[in-house]
A protein has these predicted regions:
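A general structural motif
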Residues: 68-74, 94-102
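Switch II (G3) loop of P-loop NTPases
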Residues: 34-37, 41, 48-77
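Iron-sulfur cluster-binding cysteine motifs and their immediate structural context
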Residues: 1-16
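C-terminal lobe/tail of nucleotide-utilizing enzymes
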Residues: 107-187
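FAD-binding core/adjacent interface of flavoenzyme oxidoreductases
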Residues: 12-41, 45-48
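Inter-motif core of Ras-like GTPase G domains
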Residues: 74-95
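Residues forming the flavin
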Residues: 56, 101, 117
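Structural beta-sheet core signal
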Residues: 67, 89, 117-119
Length: 187
């Protein structure tokens, strides 16, 4: 409308609504970004969040910083893994999940990053789960955990808790604790 209105009665106003936030939560500090729908520069926002998280970690003498990167394989993923020591790739057994996993492993290999894989909802498609495991074996990527679908994960989120807080003795909680211990021990 703004391009064809003969009276210039309509103007587009471009405003970047993407924001970075930092604050405390029940387990420590968190830095995160919120990208408004349709906004560009998501890689730039991820970089800003990563840099602020690094400052927070240094200021609070934290040895481990976890960056939860975006899904997919675009620029925001590259921005999220830049300067990290390790990458945990969480995938699901779907055609697109397998495709993105392969591309992400290619990227992490180019950066010479130690990578692990977690297969989320590993039981929803056993054929693709097997393809994921075979691909990881062939590329020498360790699978940290295979997490089956569990409706208790949803219930934990409804209760605003992690699954480990909600059901600490559940199979998924135990698998996640084991994965965390492997990561922090570097094995």
């Amino acid at each position: 409308c703004s391009r064809i209105c003969p009276y210039d009665a309509i103007n587009n106003i471009y405003e970047d609504k993407s924001r970075m936030y930092a604050g405390s939560f029940r387990n420590g500090r968190m830095v995160y970004g919120r990208l408004a729908p349709g906004e560009e520069n998501s890689g730039k926002l991820v970089n800003m969040v990563r840099q602020e998280a690094k400052r927070e970690a240094e200021n609070n003498q934290l040895a481990v910083t976890i960056i939860d990167g975006p899904p997919g394989i675009g620029c925001p993923v590259i921005s999220a893994i830049t300067g990290v020591d390790h990458v945990i790739i969480v995938t699901e057994p779907s055609v697109s999940g397998l495709h993105d996993l392969k591309r992400t492993i290619e990227i992490t290999s180019k950066f010479n990053l130690k990578s692990w894989v977690i297969i989320n909802k590993s039981d929803i498609n056993s054929n693709i789960s097997e393809l994921i495991k075979t691909y990881c074996k062939n590329t020498r990527i360790d699978i940290l955990a295979e997490l089956p679908f569990d409706s208790q994960m949803v219930e934990a989120m409804v209760q605003c808790k992690s699954i480990i807080e909600w059901l600490p003795d559940s199979t998924i909680s135990q698998k996640l604790i084991h994965a965390f211990n492997r990561i922090t021990n570097g094995s």
